[in-house]
Amino acid sequence: MKDLLNLLKNQNYAHEFDSIRISLASPDMIRSWSFGEVKKPETINYRTFKPERDGLFCAKIFGPIKDYECLCGKYKRLKHRGVICEKCGVEVAPANVRRERMGHIELASPVAHIWFLKSLPSRIGLLLDMTLRDIERVLYFESFIVIDPGMTTLEKGQLLSDEQYYEALEEFGDEFDARMGAEAIQGLLADLELEDEIERLREEIPNTNSETKIKKLSKRLKLMEAFAESGNHPEWMILTVLPVLPPDLRPLVPLDGGRFATSDLNDLYRRVINRNNRLKRLLELNAPDIIVRNEKRMLQESVDALLDNGRRGRAITGSNKRPLKSLADMIKGKQGRFRQNLLGKRVDYSGRSVIVVGPTLRLHQCGLPKKMALELFKPFIFSKLEHRGLATTIKAAKKMVEREEAVVWDILDEVIREHPVMLNRAPTLHRLGIQAFEPVLIEGKAIQLHPLVCTAYNADFDGDQMAVHVPLTLEAQLEARALMMSTNNILSPANGDPIIVPSQDVVLGLYFMTRERINAKGEGMVFSDIKEVQRAYGAKKVDLQAKVKVRIRDVVIDEDRNKTVTVSVLDTTVGRALLFDIFPEGLAFSLVNQNMTKKAISRLINACYRRVGLKETVIFADQIMYTGFYYATLSGASIGVNDFVIPDEKAKIIDAAENEVKEIESQFASGLLTQGEKYNKVIDIWSRANDKVSKAMMDRLGKEKVVNKDGKEVDQDSFNSVYIMADSGARGSAAQIRQLAGMRGLMAKPDGSIIETPITANFREGLNVLQYFISTHGARKGLADTALKTANSGYLTRRLVDVAQDLVVTDLDCGTSEGLLVTPHIEGGDVVVPLGDRVLGRVTASDVYSASDNQNVVVPAGTLLDETTVETLEKAGVDEILVRSPITCETKYGVCASCYGRDLARGHLVNVGEAIGVIAAQSIGEPGTQLTMRTFHIGGAASRASAVDNIQVKHGGTVRLHNLKHIERKNGNLVVVSRSSALAIADEAGREREWYKLPYGVELSVKQGQQVAAGEIVAKWDPHTHPIITEVGGKAIFVGVEEGITVKTQTDEITGLSNIEVMDPKDRPASGKDIRPMLQLLDANGKEMKFPGTDTPVQYFLPPNSLFSLKNGDTIEVGDVIARIPQESSKTRDITGGLPRVADLFEARKPKEPSILAEISGIVSFGKETKGKKRLVITPTDNTDPFEILIPKWRQLNVFEGESVEKGEVISDGPSNPHDILRLLGVGELAKYIINEIQDVYRLQGVVINDKHIEVIVRQMIRKVDVLSSGDTTLIKGDQVELVKLLEENEKAGEEAKMPARYERVLLGITKASLATESFISAASFQETTRVLTEAAVTGKQDHLRGLKENVVVGRLIPAGTGSAYHQERRRKRMQKEGGVSAADVVQALSAELNK
């Protein structure tokens, strides 16, 4: 008997495997899988319900219908296992073999597999070098193809129409062989000599010049090599045997009423079998050619429909006009095998219910309804009942549970003790959407949730539902407790800030108790300690908000856990003293001695976590919550209509605005303004008015007059409930209060344009019908937007997860010294993100020196920068640091811990095995729903603000000039003549506090290192013209300047001054078309001047449309403006904002009219112009080849003739193209660009995301390289391969002293990068399943199952987290097997034996 059971176990024993390979199945292979041929289209006998013999459900082929019982019933029971019944031919076996046994159909005529024919690029077409059109004409019997020309003038592979074929027959007889249909194609494929073809192509590629041809040839070469290497035969793409899916995977289910529900596949198979059998008969009968041909074509079409319905021609539909679901449809799409069943499975031991608030719970608890718990923990209860001897069998235990006997509840209590359950709320946008809690049994049917975890779940109690899952095994319980317990997830993985932060009522309560109220009961009392305050408050001798003096005992704990106690009498309020009583030891009183707004509480919890650790913080968070709820109740804050105080100034402000608008309307009427200008001005006026009203309103709400104890009237912060709620951050914002008590303001039309007339009323006054109608627009658009946004944001997250899913921390340190240079993010005069925030939790890549002393190492390389180190850096005035980054990490698969730095959710160096890719994707995708969907139109205010014409310093400090090329004027001022210069102001410590770009032609009134005071103007320029500036002085001579031919004189009507304008070549008379007007400088002797240190004569070309007022022979000083090019005020461009912008950046889309960058460094000159384009030539200084580029005439250039540019400098402005940045400026600059652009979008919405998440995604976007030349490696020129693979090849080549391959990094968008991953399982489960699988099969791809997705699909532990240990162990064992035992191991084993 024991053997039997072992046998049973062995039947479904899964082999351990390390990789999966898919390839084409040969006909013999298909036959070897099969258990018999399906010959009839019948399914089951409708009377007996037994499967028909040789039909699609035949028991003889596929196995018995009942367990261990043959069809006729002769053999039953286990003892006959393996017997084949002589009567019905059925093997006695378990019924589940019907899920795995396949059959086959022998096709009477070969049929092309549609995937290899129609999935682009067509593999069959590539191999035969024919167009898809031609192949289809052969396959679907429209024309003949020559297979063997014999001794005729025909060529192999030539197509012949019917007439041509019969003509050829008459001419040559049966000397040649031409056929049609799949057998013809099969013959051609079988005749291919792959090796010879590959040789021929390899020789041909270097000898062709046309790019397109090389591309085509290398595509063919790649495919041929793939076939040759993988052992696939090309003719296997044509099917001669068709496999039949096991019947239980395409079931036939009897419905009540004698009808059957069937899988579509059965219909499709029936079609194939019917046509196949008919074709066989026709062939036996030697039917006329035309009938056989038609039948063959129909067979081809039916097989096409079975494999991929609708790919060619019209989809075959069922009885209800619905296209039938083919084999391809089964695996692709959201409802396909991959996404429905392999990546998302339903799980047992789970339940869901509505959530309600559980204000009395501790942070690690959740309330679980008894009924649910009983159902979820059933198996545990059964086993306990049996174990205790309370029930004899499982069945008895089941009965007890169903009767809900008293003892069952006691046992449930025991079972549940310390058995965590997982709570999940959909949508799970980040990993905090599933957390573990200890259940507390409650009455009722709703799950109780702790209020503090609502932020993480994004849950509210308006009817949200949550799901409960039970971790069953000990390991699962352990992981749930150690990794997923809500108490272990206090910090957000996106930015490292606490996510367990009180909100709403709790904030309101804490804010209320920490406010001061003037002249409250007990003001001015002095207390010896907090206990005394409590007694006084309890005895009602003192109010909660009274100002008092209290003696406070402050404890400070330093790094080494040493305590320092300071005792001092401080001014505070009763509420603050009471709140300080629940603080853990080690937190300063200053943290609470303020109005506790939401921000202050967040800072408090952060400080608590950093100073006193996790355990104390969790207890503290709970205490804070209970306290907050208690005092919120006491405060009695509620709002009524009268709390919305309308400011008295409102009417005045609105009147003034209306008068301004009238003024502008009259200007418009008299033609002084265009429609657009009027619109912008009006909208500006109303936005300003709205701001004024809301400021007046907040001032009015925020202050109230009270009498102090001296009897004087003073202002104090108001206790108006509305103001309290907004100011504390509990609920509502100034913008919302503005609509309630100020004015509603401007509204947008559905198309996004703003309506000129604002709604001047607010909700308290009430809207009239017109105002209400206008406001409905906005409200509806808001709802429509939200729905769209959710879908788009979810899709972005999905693409991000897919591109980064296989990035895991695999190593402690890769040892690289590369990194990214991080600087503070400064916009104009404001530090938006200080350096400390950007480098916190990163590892330094090189020694950091202090700003004042270049020898003094502040922080050595390889240090993890924590809060204290960052403070040291701030003090030392460091303003740029090279930190390690995932982008520059050199680990082969994955990233090393040092390059990643701190695990934001845990606050220490990241653990090996952390799935940083998925975390990064979630952190970027989760706030996606908060981003806007709209494109901003720059109107009014913004377009005028852009015309800045000077730089005014905000802070005093030292001037630093970066990348400056300048010349000095006579008056000592510097004039900037480079384009990428910048001016920064550094403070005493040497940190840069302000940073400004300097345009060309700016006049600076300061020098490098000069001290300036706040408010000083350091630079001026004319924003409306672009100057041309001389770099040497001399006498001006004009060349090619002829009035009416190349230039025309303009006289300004108002000032009477005259200007000479250079005419556009297209407006010049024919004689002046090719003349290029220029200005030459001569020295005092009348000789040509040269630029200092060169042989280049000093010539300034005057571009078209430039204006100048010099005369021939004028003397020119250094730094004079010789001509000005008027700048058209830049047209208002729409700025794509929000979610679409983030998607564009991650998809690496090229912008419409990107900025043009210099490809090489050198001197600029202009060549011959073509129609509509300028030819710009850059000549390098080191005599290499010059570089030419054609630029459309309308593009404004930033460079002049003779100017020198650096590689990657902007020649013509526009939105940056990330591909250019990578190519010309390298990975570092690209990373910086993408990080800053994405952070700008998120920062606008107030979302904080750590840079490293974006870096992780960027790493995945640049992991491919283009091979520029193959050297002596096996790579093909023009191929795209993984960087890792290329570096491995080059390493090999280096060891053998061969030529390495040259390459160029490429940037792929996230969708492309996901599909270009090494793992075909991951790619197929993402998008374009058919294409991915076709390619993988043809090339015989092997999937090494390195990523997370692949392992989920094959049902293994993922190689991340606790699963990474399992995978490492397996890898180690495999190495040992392959490499045998090493000598060291033997020695170790021996010594171990001897030491026993």
Swiss-Prot record:
Cofactors required: Mg(2+); Zn(2+)
Keyword Nucleotidyltransferase: yes
Enzyme Commission number(s) of this protein: 2.7.7.6
InterPro entries associated with the record: DNA-dir_RpoC_beta_prime, DNA-dir_RpoC_beta_prime_bact, RNA_pol_asu, RNA_pol_N, RNA_pol_Rpb1_1, RNA_pol_Rpb1_3, RNA_pol_Rpb1_3_sf, RNA_pol_Rpb1_4
UniProt: Mg(2+) binding residues: D460, D462, D464
SUPFAM superfamilies from the UniProt entry: beta and beta-prime subunits of DNA dependent RNA-polymerase
Entry keyword annotation includes Cell inner membrane: no
Annotated Gene3D superfamilies: 1.10.132.30, 1.10.150.390, 1.10.1790.20, 1.10.40.90, 2.40.40.20, 2.40.50.100, RNA polymerase II, clamp domain, RNA polymerase Rpb1, domain 3
Ligand binding (Zn(2+) 2): C814, C889, C896, C899
Protein name: DNA-directed RNA polymerase subunit beta'
Gene behind the chain: rpoC
Organism for this UniProt entry: Hahella chejuensis (strain KCTC 2396)
Class of the enzyme per the UniProt entry, highest EC level: transferase
